[in-house]
Amino acid sequence: GTLTTYGYLFDFTNADVNSTQNFGLRFAGGTDVSEDARVLYTLEYAIQKDYADNPQSFEAAYWLAEVGLAVYGLTFKVGMETLESDDGRSFQTPLATLHAMNGWADQFLVTPDDGLQDLYVSAGASAKGVKWLAVYHDYSSDINSLSYGSELGLLAVYPINKHYTVGAKFASYAADGRGVDTDKAWLWGEVKF
């Protein structure tokens, strides 16, 4: 596996509440268990604290634990991601694209005040040149035992050739105490020169 350490110091002069110091560790990789199977793993921990002119005093952590199995062209993963809350001030990622991480229905582009726990499972495959992916999320709060809802995401991507790719994506969020039921669908094409 690969161990990565990182530190990000954000000093936003016109949005002081987003000024934070962030330090973390990530360990990710895989181990072959047979000629056709590989166990995948990712562990990550980060701490976020107020920084510079941030008017709030807080400390919240980020946790990720994910395991998976890649076998015969299929990939299965299960994981838990937690963005903690420190008494209503949650771990935030103002420069991140949470669309890619916490569900394609975009219900968690900003971490809720009570934090976010995302328990997810995914299954992916490639067949006849098409990449398929299905992801199920179950969302809850870090504090106060709130259920936020669940989401199912489906993706298909087909590279026609080295220059053209088409894809389709669908997300269905079922609200349970946060937001409203939301369905989104995308069709797209990509051209590479």
Q: Model segments located where?
A:
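Signature for the C-terminal beta-barrel architecture of outer-membrane proteins
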Residues: 1-88, 119-121, 126, 132, ...
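Acidic/polar loop-and-plug regions of large Gram-negative outer-membrane beta-barrel proteins
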Residues: 91-104
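Extracytoplasmic loops and strand-loop junctions of Gram-negative outer membrane beta-barrel proteins
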Residues: 102-110, 114, 171
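Outer-membrane beta-barrel channel domains
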Residues: 183-192
